[in-house]
């Protein structure tokens, strides 16, 4: 079937409206991730998404949205409300929107029978004017077993994110607009948004319709305060004096060469640093050698990283992740971390822990109590574990005599302690994290230099400063001048 987008005249805008269907979204029971994927993919296909709507599981409401969107946009994509249950009403709503009847479709009847089981018959009842699109499953290279249903310019996608993504990937030809290609550029600025607002307004007035300039503050980033996005349609980001003038007017030193994909690109960046020959690079190379030795001696199921959200174990986790990316790229096992929960953890640290688990795709092994108690619990619950990678440095208490591979002491649960960072300094840790734009706990940007629980951790007095108004403020931990004052945060 010829796609509607391919029939358009060259240069004509192709637009889309997205309707997300589901009471579970409106009630907060389920987090919608489909919108982000649909918008990003459609834009990559030259399609401008103009509106997103979330509708409840109500036939009349969905039908009204479909009618409105169908008249206004080239394509309408719905997600959700397709299934065997009473609240799956999208087919019925679309039929109502176009004055169609619901009728069983022979091909869908055959497809539902192939699914096996009972209760799937409802999926074969579609609007009488429906078209079926089989596409190619990107995972198998074969046509989808169950087709995508469309009615006029409305395409009815499933709500399951993994399935929706596969279907859209296999149906790109329905929406591809070769006449238009969107180009974008991102800038990261370490300056308050209000302070650069006049500069941005003047730049947008100068660019006019050639360029869309967006400004998005980020209060949770360790590296920038504002992300600027510059978008153009059908051409690359304009050159000439416009672009240099914008960057030149931003506060001096505020542009950050930020890498938003630091975790995905960890292997390339970490090994490049290790091979640089710099002082830090040599420390990285030594740590990687220890980690690679561990990977040669133990499987991933026998290893875990001791992780409490601190700066040292964050650097260690990134190194370990990079080494696994390089040495074991095809091993599906997630990396394991051991988290020993304190009695009163910082909420910010707990949030960072959850973000890190998602960011690195980790499996968390949780324990409580002292280190000795936690290792005993770990051994009892996960007997396959044999070694724990630790972010210990020689300057830590009771650590000056450790070796890269140190068995636990007699009387302790038997584990091999692997210490890749023994010879690293406080400055080495921060240089590594900051140079590679590794995300770390936001508390370090608020004056804490060493993290424990809320009961034994305070801001480091060495970082305290007075603001112009006379109020006390704290510089970030990476600006600590005397490394011997690192543990001033612990009481």
From Swiss-Prot:
Start and end residues of each stretch annotated as FAD synthase: 302-459
Positions of region (Disordered): 461-491
A family per Pfam: MoCF_biosynth
Residues the record lists as N6-succinyllysine modifications: 282
InterPro entries documented for this protein: FAD_synth_MoaB/Mog-bd, FLAD1_M, MoaB/Mog-like_dom_sf, MoaB/Mog_dom, PAPS_reduct_dom, Rossmann-like_a/b/a_fold
Chief location: cytoplasm
GO biological process: FAD biosynthetic process
Record-listed N6-acetyllysine modification sites: 282
Enzyme Commission number(s) from the entry: 2.7.7.2
Pathway: Cofactor biosynthesis; FAD biosynthesis; FAD from FMN: step 1/1
Homology family: In the N-terminal section; belongs to the MoaB/Mog family.
Name by which UniProt lists this protein: FAD synthase
Organism: Pongo abelii (Sumatran orangutan)
């Amino acid at each position: 079937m010829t796609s509607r987008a391919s029939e358009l005249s060259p240069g004509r805008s192709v637009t889309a409206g997205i309707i997300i269907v589901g009471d579970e979204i409106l009630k907060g029971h389920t987090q919608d991730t489909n919108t982000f994927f649909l918008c990003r993919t459609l834009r990559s296909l030259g399609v401008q998404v103009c509106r997103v709507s979330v509708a409840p599981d109500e036939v009349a409401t969905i039908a009204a949205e479909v009618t409105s969107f169908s008249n206004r946009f080239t394509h309408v994509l719905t997600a959700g409300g397709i299934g065997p249950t009473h609240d799956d009403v999208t087919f019925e709503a679309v039929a109502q929107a176009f004055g169609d009847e619901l009728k069983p479709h022979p091909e869908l009847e055959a497809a539902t029978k192939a699914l096996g089981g009972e209760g799937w018959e409802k999926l074969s009842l579609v609007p009488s004017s429906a078209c079926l699109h089989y596409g190619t499953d990107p995972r198998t290279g074969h046509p989808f077993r169950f087709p995508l249903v469309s009615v006029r310019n409305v395409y009815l996608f499933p709500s399951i994110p993994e399935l929706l993504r596969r279907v859209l990937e296999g149906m790109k030809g329905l929406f591809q607009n070769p006449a238009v290609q969107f180009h974008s550029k991102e800038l990261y600025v370490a300056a308050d948004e209000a302070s650069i607002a006049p500069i941005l307004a003047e730049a947008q007035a100068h660019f006019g319709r050639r360029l869309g300039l967006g400004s998005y503050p980020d209060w949770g980033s360790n590296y920038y305060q504002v992300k600027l996005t510059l978008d153009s349609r059908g051409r690359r980001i304009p050159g000439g004096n416009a672009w240099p003038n914008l960057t030149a007017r931003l506060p001096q030193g505020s542009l950050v060469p930020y890498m938003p994909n630091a975790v995905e690109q960890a292997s390339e960046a970490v090994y490049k640093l290790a091979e640089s020959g710099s002082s830090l690079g040599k420390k990285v190379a030594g740590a990687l050698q220890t980690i690679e030795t561990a990977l040669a001696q133990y499987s991933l199921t026998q290893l875990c990283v001791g992780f409490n959200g601190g700066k040292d174990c964050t650097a260690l986790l990134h190194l370990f992740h990079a080494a696994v990316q390089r040495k074991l790229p095809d091993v599906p096992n997630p990396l394991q971390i051991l988290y020993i929960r304190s009695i009163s953890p910082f909420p910010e640290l707990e949030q960072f822990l959850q973000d890190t688990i998602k960011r690195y795709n980790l499996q968390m092994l949780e324990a409580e109590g002292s280190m000795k108690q936690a290792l005993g619990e770990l051994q009892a619950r996960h007997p396959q574990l044999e070694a724990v990678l630790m972010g210990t440095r020689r300057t830590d208490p009771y650590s000056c005599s450790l070796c890269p591979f140190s068995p636990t002491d007699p009387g302790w649960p038997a584990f091999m302690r692997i210490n890749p960072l023994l010879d690293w300094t406080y400055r080495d840790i921060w240089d590594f994290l900051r140079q590679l734009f590794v995300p770390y706990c936001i508390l370090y940007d608020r004056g804490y230099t060493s993290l424990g629980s809320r009961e034994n951790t305070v801001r480091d007095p060495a970082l305290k400063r007075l603001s112009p108004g006379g109020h006390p403020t704290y510089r970030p931990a990476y600006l600590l001048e005397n490394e011997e004052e690192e543990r001033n945060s612990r009481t």
